[in-house]
Amino acid sequence: MDLLRTEFDIQHHLVLSRKDTLHHALIRMIVSTLSTPEELTNLRKKDFRFNKGKNLDYYTVKLSEGGRSRISPVDKRTFEIIQTMPSQPFRMSEEEMNEIVRSYSPPGRIYTCKKLREAVESILSDSDLFGVKLRNDEERYAFMLDFNPLYSGLWDLEDEEGVEDFILSYSEVTGSRDWRKISDETGIEAEIVKKVIESGKKSILRFRADF
């Protein structure tokens, strides 16, 4: 699958889930840490840590599955959202988690927790995550800051260009140019959506062979 389309699919889940904190936090955890359903079920707020590193401050979370545990980087915004939630944020079954992820899938695609995790892995693999020796938690966080767009804020629509790109791609994938409808579905301010749609610009997805 084309990586640009894969990136859009991931961002589609992130943007459209923002209206529901629980759903949004679940999706963010998968995208930020590659969490499995069992790891999410076992998660506690006390498993999160803020760390002062040699070169940068960073965030980590302890994830547990089948009697084993791992330490993963987690982006700052996801860390902050989880801190507002109950001590055990995701008290639900794997099927319930899959249904949440599925409900934010783009038209014509069906994602589950596993498929969303694999989509993120494909983005990171393209950045050679699995070919780089990262010696400690700080280096792993720095890598994610460079190569996982959730860490930099790009997938959170924190800059004007990123917002424009998402709106154009959303319009292309859904086939809708109704700026009011797009605003309602994405939660992006109506005047911003209207300006982008009426600009006449086209999404880069239109020019991808496997779109």
UniProtKB/Swiss-Prot annotation:
Q: Which domain of life is it from?
A: Archaea
The identity of this protein, by name, is Uncharacterized protein AF_1003
Which species is the source of this protein? Archaeoglobus fulgidus (strain ATCC 49558 / DSM 4304 / JCM 9628 / NBRC 100126 / VC-16)
Q: What is the lineage of its organism?
A: Archaea, Methanobacteriati, Methanobacteriota, Archaeoglobi, Archaeoglobales
